[in-house]
From Swiss-Prot:
This is Spindle pole component BBP1. Component of the spindle pole body (SPB) required for insertion of the nascent SPB into the nuclear envelope and for the proper execution of spindle pole body (SPB) duplication. Connects the central plaque of the SPB with the half-bridge. Required for proper localization of CDC5 at the SPB and for proper M-phase progression. Keywords: Coiled coil, Cytoplasm, Cytoskeleton, Phosphoprotein. Residues 34-76 are annotated as: Disordered. Its main location: cytoplasm. Homodimer. Interacts with KAR1, MPS2 and SPC29. The modification Phosphoserine is found at S29, S73, S115. It comes from Saccharomyces cerevisiae (strain JAY291) (Baker's yeast).
Length: 419
């Protein structure tokens, strides 16, 4: 078993040693050892073996503790260790290996896990039911208010702890608590003596009574029962890890499906937006054309109204002009008729005047002839003189077309008529 411990091999001996050291050899449980540790610790505070030299035993409290560093199970953690022990690599939120992809948060976490864990932390995280006796004895218990900001909710230890009750009888524990002697670390079963312990103390350590040996055998049986239970828990943990891995793969597949659907939906949305933009532009241009056509239509309607008004006015003016034309034509007809009547009347008057003149001239000439005949004899009128009168031209008839009037003679006739 020592060879297995020195070589760092696995198996039941390594598991037994690791569990034993976790329960009794250190001041912190394995569940608390790798939770939320500081990134950088003072490596000189930890020993390189499984002995805690900073513990104080009895009256040796003034003894100077040796500052040594100690390695842990995270030392040398790399991909080879993952393949050797079939460990799952660290994945970031995107589903890739955070160590390979250079995730800063995961690198910090791995660095903190690989750094040595403190044997006696300055501020323990929380009191768990699986804490060892040494941690409960030498560690100040934190209050609930101090643990209120923790990521994991605080669970106070139960009065009847199932793990501790399986190792120890409750009556025995109560009896030890009621004893007047103070419980020391050396009284804890399974505790190995410190290398700095005196030789006589080592000899006394191996000298035990029969009851102590019997109790140790019972404890050993309980240890193996716990190891079997831990083996079952490890198998359940492996199954759980497998389920987690399958769920993670399913999650990544679903995420890829959702991502592809999102990309398709996004592309479709972009196309719809482009179509909507084109439709809006066409609608806007159509609206502008509609406004211009409506404006032209309004102008056309206004022009048509003006044209109808002008046409009506022209029709009225045309009717008025036609009425005036008819009136003028009627007046012209009346004037023409009146002119014709006047012309006829004038012709008749002229004929009457000519006939009267002819009669008067004839009377005058007869009167003159009678006067001459009485005064001068029968030769008063010569033939030549008689022929010069316009009314005595051959057949003693009046020529209406003859214009050779003796104006002086007619003047005398007019003067005679006036007298």
């Amino acid at each position: 078993m020592n060879q297995e411990d020195n070589t760092g091999g696995g198996g039941i001996f390594g598991l037994f040693k690791w569990t034993k050291d976790a329960l009794f050899g250190t001041d912190i449980s394995p569940s608390m050892k790798y939770k939320d540790q500081e990134e950088r610790r003072d490596r000189s505070r930890y020993a390189q073996d499984d002995t805690n030299f900073s513990m104080k035993f009895g009256n040796d409290s003034n003894r100077r503790s040796t500052n040594l560093s100690r390695s842990n199970s995270w030392s040398g953690l790399d991909s080879t260790l993952h393949r050797k022990y079939e460990l799952l690599p660290e994945y970031n939120e995107n589903g890739f290996n955070s160590i390979v992809n250079g995730d800063h948060h995961s690198k910090e976490r791995i660095r903190s896990l690989r750094s040595p864990a403190p044997i006696v932390p300055r501020e323990p995280l929380r009191n768990e039911p699986t804490d060892t006796f040494g941690h409960r004895l030498h560690t100040k218990r934190r209050t609930i208010n101090e643990l209120s900001n923790s990521q994991i909710p605080f669970i106070p230890p139960q009065e009847d702890d199932p793990l501790l009750s399986k190792l120890f009888n409750k009556d025995g524990v109560n009896e030890v608590r009621r004893s007047p002697y103070k419980l020391s670390v050396k009284d804890i079963p399974g505790k190995f003596p410190s290398p700095l312990t005196k030789r006589d103390e080592i000899d006394n350590y191996y000298v035990r009574d029969e009851d102590a040996c019997h109790n140790n055998r019972e404890y050993k049986k309980a240890y193996f029962d716990l190891f079997a239970q831990m083996d079952l828990n490890s198998r359940d943990l492996e199954d759980l890890c497998e389920d987690v891995r399958e769920q993670r793969e399913q999650f990544h597949r679903n995420e890829q499906t959702y991502k592809q659907a999102y990309e398709e939906m996004r592309a479709e949305l972009v196309n719809e937006l482009k179509k909507s933009k084109t439709l809006f532009e066409n609608y806007y241009s159509l609206g502008q054309k509609y406004k211009s056509l409506k404006k032209v239509l309004d102008q056309t309607i206004s022009h048509e109204a003006e044209l109808a008004t002008s046409r009506e006015r022209l029709y009225q003016e045309e009717d008025l002009k036609n009425f005036e034309i008819q009136t003028l034509k009627q007046r012209l007809s009346d004037l023409e008729l009146k002119y014709t009547n006047l012309q006829i009347e004038k012709d008749m008057q002229r004929d009457n005047y000519e006939s009267e003149i002819h009669d008067l001239l004839l009377q005058l000439s007869l009167r003159n002839n009678e006067r001459k005949d009485t005064s001068a004899g029968s030769n008063i009128f010569s033939t030549g003189q008689y022929d010069r009168t316009p009314f005595h031209n051959g057949n003693n008839s009046y020529d209406s077309n003859s214009h050779s009037w003796d104006t002086d003679y007619l003047k005398n006739i007019d003067g005679f008529i006036e007298r």
